[in-house]
Amino acid sequence: MRAAWCFLFWLRCCWPRWEPACAAAPQGTLRGLRLSWSYPTAAGGLSSGGPEVLDTLFADAAAYAQAHGLNALFLDVADAELSSIAFRDRAYETWPGTAADDSLFYKYDPLRALCEQASQAGLAVYAVTPELSGNADWEAALARMQKKYAVAGLYVEGSALFDSISRQAVFYADEAAFNDPSSLFLASLDTDGFHGAVFDYARCRAQPEAFSVLASALDGSAARPALLEYTPGGTLAVSYPADGAAVYTSACFVMGTSDPAQELLLNGTPVESRGPGGTFGVLVDVAEGSNVYTLTQGGTSVSVTVNRPAPAGGGSGGTTEVPHDDTAEVEPGTPVRIRNWIASLLYDPASDGNISETVRQGAVATVAACTETLRGGKRTWAYQLASGDFVLAYNAEPLPPETPRASFTGAAAAATDTGEVLTFAGSGTPLAYTNMVDGALVMDFYDADFAADFAVSGSALVQSAAVDPGDGCTRVTLTFTQPVWGHTVEYADGTTQVILKKQPVRSDVFGKPLTGVAVLLDAGHGDHDPGAMGAAGTGAPAEKDVNLALTLAAKYRLEQLGATVQTIRTDDSFLSLEERNRAIVAGQPDFFIAVHHNSIDLSVDANLQTGTECYYFYPAGKALAQALVRNVTQATSRPDRGAQWGYYYVTRSTVCPAVLLEAGFMVNPSEYENVTSEPQLWAAGDAIARSVLECVPPG
């Protein structure tokens, strides 16, 4: 018996023991993976696992962390009740989580096992423990632990996950964060308070796509842009209307700035509608003649005078001839060519909103009849085409009567970076109506002849081409071998081309799910065109400034997610609507978003106008418009005004989903402070990026 005890004593003293290596914290931003007791081992957690199962779990977790660019493993070394312990310390008498697997010569130690796996993978290890007592001596606890284990630190879980020594908190991506991946991005914007992120391993395995989006927020390779340097001022001032202004309505919305800490009076009556920063707006009655409005705050007063002229007297009763512009009537059968970059084909020439089709510069059609209509206070001609729709005469130029009909024998395909270009063999640039029907491209060409055996050669996208001659037009239907995302009929040098765009797909590159996706962002207005005036007036951000700030925020977040982002402007410059629309065709993006902020006539109460809306023209843009409204309103708490059809110039492209976002109202005082707030700009920018991600089909 004595010999046995001596042997055991010798074994304990002399048997080689694993010594902890120097435990160093990882360089750069902390990116950790946490193993917790909240899940069974099969799901990536610690509970219900014996030594062999836990060893496998630790090896898998280390490999997973290494593969996903993480630099640390976090292990829950005790559950909340101390009923399960994952390390050995003489302060605790039992280790219920591992005791069943102990033997005389072997004591399984989960923390040591994890440290060994982490060391091989080049990962740091941190222990996580419940906050058992506010007076706990964490320095002593960590020092005692580091005598036996290669741990870089001890983190304590209370209301947050924080370092036991420095008390610096890290972002813990738990179930709530995985269900709202924007949370980590917004937390990372706190330059001083953000020290890294730790991801729940079980959640990573269960929700890999959300993990990818969450992790993208840790990409700091690009410099974060400066947005708006604006704080609502406390100076009493009126931004609208100007002193001495003439107003022709019975009401006027008076806007300006004030000190939010002091009461504001307008002609002795308290002004209730103010933003947190003191920006105010109030609807006032305007009587005929001179109206004086005096704003008072503390010992300061500001007055503006508004004049409302009396209505002009009645006329002589005679008729006034409406002038005619310089367009001309043409004979039926005259060919005409579209002269502008895009033009509307109208059901009714009296209304610009009755659009049947948008056609591009160079399209040729035949006039069936002419009719007069009004535009801009002048009479003008409208040409009714063979299709039955009308084009306004100033959008078209007459051609010689002997202009030949278009004629085509086939088409040849050439691959591009984004799809293919089909060049028609033959001559002519006929007017075409296009539509996507059940994944096929249906094109109706007017005044054009097609060979019965018309086919597309050399295409990897086009599966078949069917020609169906009809009454006045020929229908060409293209089916495809894979989904086509967009198309454009282009005319150049007397030839007709169809540009086909391949469908983008979500990438499986970790942290970069938008790799390969191209987005074109258009910050509305610019330079001499300020857009809507803000409620704070001159010297404060105008719409053009807020549009650019939100565009830059969205660009930054989209690029974090892997997208290739182009912007129409990156400074205070101006581009025409045509230049903006041309950029869509030239760039062939997968998504186009025009970023704007709203306004309204200032004869109504702008305090009642609030929220986000988004416009699309073609059906392909509807889903993107809906996603933008949903996500921006959720991120900013602005009201949802819906996705709506509209014929804005920049949205009239079939290249890709194209929308115009009105993110919020510039003339609503409270919402003005909201849309110019940097945290809200980042939240809305992230919402734009998430909307794009939602609309990209899975790979």
Where are these regions (language model features)?
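Short linear recognition/processing motifs and adjacent strand/loop elements at protein termini
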Residues: 240, 247-249, 260-261, 272-297, ...
